[in-house]
């Protein structure tokens, strides 16, 4: 559930309406790069229709796993397609709400979070009467073959268990409320060796390993005073979290040397290491005084050298570099068939 933080992109992750996928348009072969986007070339749209996001490369860079409401689905399910957008196919159960798919090293298995056992239908959206918040559904982690077969649960615990990604050397990092807060944990691919990585009050999530598996980048909220902490805990008791203040953090893969990278005072999320291990790409609304528009930014891992990457007037988010660093996949509202439609795009990365 590496969600986009504000109501502008709410249909992407919370109130998905049933829609059927539209056929590819001329955009499939047209460069959708904006003039200011000097680090991007050959921006191509890979999905058309429905809501599509959180597309992540396989370790060989040949395939993408992503979540979508295509085929008239009311809730996100997981799909796999070629890195060129070819042959999309359902790999989750078609029940409940599904999020955060990821490939195992080797590409023969996948991991995702789903509510299909606790809520076979779409779980209800959160009550927004007290302000915008994310619902912490009762997600559990599941492992399956790459075609969706042989499904089984992994490291089950009551509450929220999601936002799982995998390192090249066979570790899973994920967010869970199993100890009462939204913290990061890691474990082996079979669920053994479970270790809690964070224990500071606040939301720690959206974690990814560096290419060598030695470090983790993640987003975090940190209540600044007793009042904010009380508000955070009150929402958590209702299975909600408010994501309006998120910063990017890094730590060693064992949880040591936790360090805040950004100090933007904004909603910054979806961080991912460049394969060089020195730079981090992420999404943020820091450039919009109204907090509604999200773009991609690049920053050095020490917080220096902040650079804006995309200049779309609506939403760009969920960036991921290909393993060789030559491609960037991301989700965007650009070129939608209707306002707010989110699709998956791929671009050449230009240094």
Residue ranges of model-derived segments:
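Hydrophobic beta-strand positions that form the internal "hydrophobic ladder"
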Residues: 64-65, 110, 172-173, 216, ...
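Blade/loop signatures of beta-propeller domains
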Residues: 23-41, 139
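Bacterial N-terminal signal peptides
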Residues: 7-15
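Residue-level detector of Asp-centered blade-edge/turn motifs that repeat once per structural unit
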Residues: 59-60, 105-106, 167-168, 211-212, ...
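Short loop/turn segments that connect beta-strands within beta-propeller blades
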Residues: 82-86, 145-149, 188-192, 252-256, ...
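Beta-strand-rich domains and repeat architectures in extracellular enzymes and scaffolds
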Residues: 31-33, 41-74
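A flexible loop/linker signature enriched in serine peptidases of the S9 family
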Residues: 48-51, 68-78, 93-98, 113-140, ...
């Amino acid at each position: 559930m590496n969600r986009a933080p504000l109501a502008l992109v709410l249909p992407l992750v919370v109130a998905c309406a049933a829609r059927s996928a539209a056929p590819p348009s001329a955009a499939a072969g047209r460069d959708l790069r904006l003039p200011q986007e000097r680090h991007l070339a050959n921006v191509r749209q890979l999905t058309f229709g429905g809501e599509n996001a959180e597309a992540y490369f396989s370790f060989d860079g040949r395939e993408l796993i992503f979540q979508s409401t295509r085929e008239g689905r009311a809730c996100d399910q997981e799909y796999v397609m070629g890195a060129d957008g070819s042959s999309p196919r359902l790999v989750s159960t078609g029940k409940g709400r599904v999020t955060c798919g990821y490939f195992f090293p080797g590409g023969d298995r996948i991991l995702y979070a789903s509510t299909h056992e606790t809520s076979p239908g779409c779980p209800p959206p959160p009550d927004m009467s007290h302000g915008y918040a994310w619902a912490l559904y009762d997600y559990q982690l599941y492992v399956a073959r790459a075609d969706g077969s042989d499904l089984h649960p992994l490291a089950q615990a009551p509450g929220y268990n999601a936002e799982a990604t995998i390192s090249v050397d066979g570790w899973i990092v994920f967010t869970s409320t199993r100890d009462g807060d939204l913290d990061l944990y890691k474990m082996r691919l079979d669920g053994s060796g479970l270790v809690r990585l964070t224990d500071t009050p606040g939301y720690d999530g959206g974690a990814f390993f560096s290419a060598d598996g030695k470090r983790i980048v993640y987003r975090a909220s940190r209540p600044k005073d007793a009042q904010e902490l009380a508000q955070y805990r009150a929402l958590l008791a209702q299975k909600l979290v408010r994501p309006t203040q998120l910063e990017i953090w890094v730590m060693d893969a064992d949880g040591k040397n936790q360090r805040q990278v950004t100090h933007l005072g904004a909603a910054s999320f979806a961080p991912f290491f460049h394969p060089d291990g020195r730079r981090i790409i992420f999404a943020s609304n820091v450039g919009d005084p109204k907090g509604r528009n999200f773009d991609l930014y690049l920053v050095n891992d020490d917080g220096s050298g902040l650079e804006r990457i995309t200049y779309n007037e609506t939403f760009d988010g969920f960036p991921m570099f290909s393993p060789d660093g030559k491609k960037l996949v991301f989700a965007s509202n650009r070129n939608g068939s209707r306002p707010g439609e989110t699709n998956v795009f791929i671009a050449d990365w230009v240094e």
